[in-house]
């Protein structure tokens, strides 16, 4: 496969009505068999979750979630995320503004690196 994974249109989430963006730290129950795989499978099915990253540190995963409003996020939290059996703790931080949001990789100078 080449360098291009896929071609997409970048949509304006606010114009489409998704005014709330939340970054969610999730800690899973320790020692639960298959907890990571089950969590990942369920999160992949949630359309509200734009990104899911496994972390090293205090929490296990970081999710980027969008909803139309705060009530929509509350419903997502209560009816989807919090009922996953392996979820032990959730910490939510609502974004007030996006200072930089890009999908561009820093390609300038990529081949000019000196490994010597």
Predicted regions and their residues:
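A compositional/biophysical signature of low hydrophobicity enriched in polar/charged and small residues
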Residues: 1-116
């Amino acid at each position: 496969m080449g360098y291009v994974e896929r071609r997409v249109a970048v949509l304006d989430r606010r114009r489409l009505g998704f005014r709330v963006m939340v970054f969610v730290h999730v800690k899973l129950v320790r020692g639960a068999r298959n907890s990571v795989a089950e969590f990942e499978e369920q999160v992949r099915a949630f359309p509200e979750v734009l990104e899911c990253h496994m972390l090293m540190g205090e929490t296990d995963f970081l999710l980027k979630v969008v909803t139309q409003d705060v009530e929509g996020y509350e419903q997502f939290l209560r009816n989807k995320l919090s009922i996953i059996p392996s979820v032990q703790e959730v910490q939510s931080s609502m974004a007030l503004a996006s200072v930089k949001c890009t999908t561009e990789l820093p390609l300038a100078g990529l081949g000019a690196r000196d490994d010597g």
